[in-house]
From Swiss-Prot:
GO terms for biological process: amino acid biosynthetic process; aromatic amino acid family biosynthetic process; chorismate biosynthetic process. The keyword Protease does not apply. This is 3-phosphoshikimate 1-carboxyvinyltransferase. Pathway: Metabolic intermediate biosynthesis; chorismate biosynthesis; chorismate from D-erythrose 4-phosphate and phosphoenolpyruvate: step 6/7. It is an enzyme of class 2 (transferase). Belongs to the EPSP synthase family. One of its GO terms (molecular function) is 3-phosphoshikimate 1-carboxyvinyltransferase activity. It holds the Pfam family EPSP_synthase. It comes from Lactococcus lactis subsp. cremoris (strain MG1363). The lineage of its organism: Bacteria, Bacillati, Bacillota, Bacilli, Lactobacillales.
Length: 430
């Protein structure tokens, strides 16, 4: 795909697609709950479709009329052994969270995925589930897909300290704990996104959260609910950055989810001096309207507890930093190496090919700001990573002459099927 965008500034209002994390979980909770769950504004990206198809294969009736999705849950014990292996596509969330559910079911299921997902570590989720009584066998000693899970109807509660800051691993243990005998205790070293905990309560479940300690009693029964999915702040992040770095821009993003475990990017924008307004806050829905306009930015440091609250936004934050005055340092983000790609290396390579000055490190990047971007000599390949594709497309807005050849642009379908339509709407051309 060729990108040649001569933007005179981005203008307009936009409603970004539904939050990917909440979309996954709404299908999962609806499938293990008893009764009907109705979901509004779900993200119909490839990852969420993988979750839907997996639960259909487990015997759950899921209807989509194009407006709302209806999940006819019969309770977790009614899930059935799949007739064939479950295709997880490129979705780490689908794989890891579903593993927690399968761990407590008395049958065997095999999960497989695409080349990218098959390289990602699954031992981090296999270890606690094995401690609880599930049998899990992966492709290697490190446990990678394809992975076979033989669940147990007699899971035992455990006390578990998460070795990595991962909402996916935490959520897998919570889903397994719902089926276990006794009280499961999960301790986080760094707080990660809290959608699973909050949605468990919404579906009538019991959970106690005290700072970084989570207690989940076993043997729980959940009830179907009506869910409205807010806009995804990870998708909104691309427009927030575009509005800040493209001259003469002013954007309003409506109904964006602002769960406090996901708003690290807003704090970074404010720390860098970006003109950002948070309007029309809905405390119950945890959503707001966000308004940005082109700004003079300065470098900052991003590290520590902030990292889990913006881990998925770091690629586009790196682009933001290239346009800020001074140096931006990102550290404590080694988790980027095991995302859809090694995002430390891939982000640095892509932006450096356009004239940026980024030094990759073991756990982040050092970015010298104030750089003018140009079209690269060679094509940039997303390597199947949706966030890399969107980062490059936003970077193209800053290139005055020439065009960018973006290979495997279809990866963007993972989380934002209407991305290029929205880009055309806001920029006036593509």
């Amino acid at each position: 795909m060729k990108l040649k965008i001569n933007s005179q500034g981005l203008k307009g209002r936009l409603k970004v697609p539904g939050d990917k994390s909440i979309s996954h979980r709404s299908i999962m909770f609806g499938s293990i709950a008893k009764g009907k769950t109705i979901i509004h504004d779900i993200l119909r990206g490839e990852d969420v479709l993988s979750t839907i198809e997996a639960f259909r294969a487990l015997g759950v009736e899921i209807e989509d009329d194009g407006q709302v999705i209806t999940v006819h849950g019969q309770g977790i014990s009614k899930l059935k052994e799949p007739e064939k292996a479950l295709d997880m596509g490129n979705s780490g969330t689908s794989t890891r969270l579903l593993s927690g559910i399968l761990a407590g079911l008395p049958f065997e299921a095999t999960l497989f995925g695409d080349d990218s997902l098959s390289k990602r570590p699954m031992d981090r989720v296999a270890t606690p589930l094995q401690m609880m009584g599930a049998e899990i066998v992966g492709q290697t000693d490190k446990v990678k897909l394809p992975m076979t899970i033989k669940g147990s109807a007699h899971l035992k509660a455990i006390d578990y300290i998460l070795p990595v800051a991962s909402a996916q691993v935490k959520s897998a243990v919570i889903f397994a704990a719902l089926q276990a005998e006794g009280l499961t205790k999960v301790v986080e070293k760094e707080k990660t996104r809290s959608h699973t905990e909050e949605m468990l309560v919404q579906f009538g479940g019991e959970i106690t959260v005290s700072d970084k300690t989570i207690l989940v009693p076993g043997g729980q029964k959940l009830l179907g609910q009506e869910v409205t999915v807010p806009g995804d702040i990870s998708s909104a992040a691309f427009w927030l950055v575009a509005g800040l770095v493209v001259e003469n821009s002013g954007l309003i993003l409506e109904n964006v989810g602002i769960n406090e475990t996901r708003t690290g990017i807003l704090e970074v924008i404010q720390a860098m001096g970006g003109q950002l307004e948070i309007l029309e806050q809905d405390e119950v829905a945890k959503a707001a309207t966000l308004k940005v306009k082109a700004s003079q930015l300065k470098g900052t440091e991003i590290s520590g507890d902030l990292i889990p609250r913006l881990i998925d936004e770091l690629p586009i934050i790196a682009l933001l930093a290239t346009q800020a005055e001074g140096k931006t340092i990102i550290r404590d983000a080694a988790e980027l190496k095991v995302k859809e790609t090694d995002r430390i290396a891939v982000v640095a390579d892509a932006l450096n090919s356009m004239g940026a000055n980024i030094e990759p490190t073991d756990d982040g990047m050092i970015i010298q700001g104030g750089t003018k971007l140009h079209a690269p000599e060679n094509a940039i390949n997303t390597l199947g990573d949706h966030r890399i594709g969107m980062m490059v497309a936003i970077a193209a807005l800053l290139v005055e002459n020439g065009e960018i050849e973006l290979e495997r642009a279809e990866a963007i379908q993972t989380s934002y099927p209407s991305f290029f339509d929205d880009l055309e709407k806001l920029s006036g051309n593509l």
